[in-house]
Amino acid sequence: MIYEDELRQMHALVDRARAAGVDAVIASDLSAILYARRIGMEVHISTQCNLTNSEAVKFFSQWADVVVLARELSLDQIGRIARAIDEQQICGPSGDPVRIEMFAHGALCMAVSGKCYLSLHETGCSANRGACRQICRRKYTLTDVETGAQLAAEGQYLLSPKDLCTIDFLDRFIGAGVRVLKIEGRARGAEYVLSLI
């Protein structure tokens, strides 16, 4: 999400990325997508766009050769989208079929991709603007407000699913049509990412 008074800052940031030799930007805000394309930068459509079907992929294909599908999709759903890309010849600006990018490792959000407001509500930092404070990954207890009784729950990480780890079924990811693998890096140190490669 980029607000009106942030457009110049976004332009300057994308300009600096291009000048530094960055290959592509990952974006969800249409202003960033359009500006990056206007200055000749490749765009990858972010998971924040919550792409869950081939019509959404077709819409964004006018600006991007790579789309990051929503993390909530099953392998079957990813496969159906990949087949639709092939069957309908959904191509990006390069003229090649759009490539599907998926997270191969990292945190799973307890909310729908691009729709979490917990961090904003609790800390004033919006996950939808790349500033998630991962409030969901803290330990919590579940209490019945009417009786005060603590309810039984497995573990204390009630809002935090286990991290995504696809190493044991990368072949199924690739078989479903995933062409680009993504490792979560935001809010992680370089050592974390290095240990996974």
Predicted regions and their residues:
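Active-site pocket-lining/capping segments in soluble small-molecule metabolic enzymes
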Residues: M1-L51, E55, V68, D76-I78, ...
